[in-house]
């Protein structure tokens, strides 16, 4: 965990505003350690600029508060973990980051379950399964 921390994966402005305790349960810490080590840190090393986590882990209450689906990988369902990331420099910079991630996937440098361009590069969703096959799906929503 060179560039990201578990604390970043737990932080949520929505949780803070609504008084929701959003701590990763001990049984799911490994999911986020693996997401950081195998996906986020390699992305950050390639991008060479700061990357910010908008949403990492979500407890059930937080997931409901943000309108997340019941099967959201942010909740560690099916041995997974997810993070919504951004450059904080706008859509064009996020688009560049998205294509860097896409290239890392296509060249076999990282595996992800899903890479999603959300809302025309407002943010980027990346997810990873710690057990089972990562699908390397590249999508736009």
Where do the language-model regions lie?
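Extended, low-complexity, intrinsically disordered C-terminal regulatory tails
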Residues: 37-68
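Extracytoplasmic cell-surface/polysaccharide-interacting catalytic and binding patches
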Residues: 1-46, 135-141
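Short connector loops at helix/strand junctions that flank enzyme active sites
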Residues: 46-48, 78-82
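A broad, low-specificity signal marking well-ordered, structured residues that form hydrophobic/aromatic
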Residues: 51, 83, 124
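Amphipathic alpha-helical interface surfaces
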Residues: 35, 39, 62, 81, ...
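Catalytic cores and adjacent binding grooves of peptidoglycan-active enzymes
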Residues: 73-79, 87-141
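Solvent-exposed, flexible loop/coil residues
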Residues: 8, 13-15, 61, 66, ...
């Amino acid at each position: 965990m060179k560039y990201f921390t578990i604390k970043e994966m737990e932080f949520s402005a929505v949780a803070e505003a609504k008084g929701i305790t959003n701590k990763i349960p001990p049984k799911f810490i490994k999911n986020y350690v693996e997401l950081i080590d195998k996906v986020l840190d390699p992305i950050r090393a390639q991008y060479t600029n700061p990357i910010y986590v908008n949403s990492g882990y979500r407890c059930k209450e937080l997931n409901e508060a943000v309108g997340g689906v019941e099967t959201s990988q942010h909740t560690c369902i099916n041995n997974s973990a997810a993070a919504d990331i951004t450059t904080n420099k706008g859509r064009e910079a996020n688009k560049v980051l998205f294509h860097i991630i896409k290239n890392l996937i296509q060249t076999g440098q990282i595996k992800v379950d899903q890479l999603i361009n959300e809302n025309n590069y407002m943010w980027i969703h990346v997810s990873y399964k710690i057990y089972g096959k990562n699908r390397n799906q590249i999508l736009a929503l």
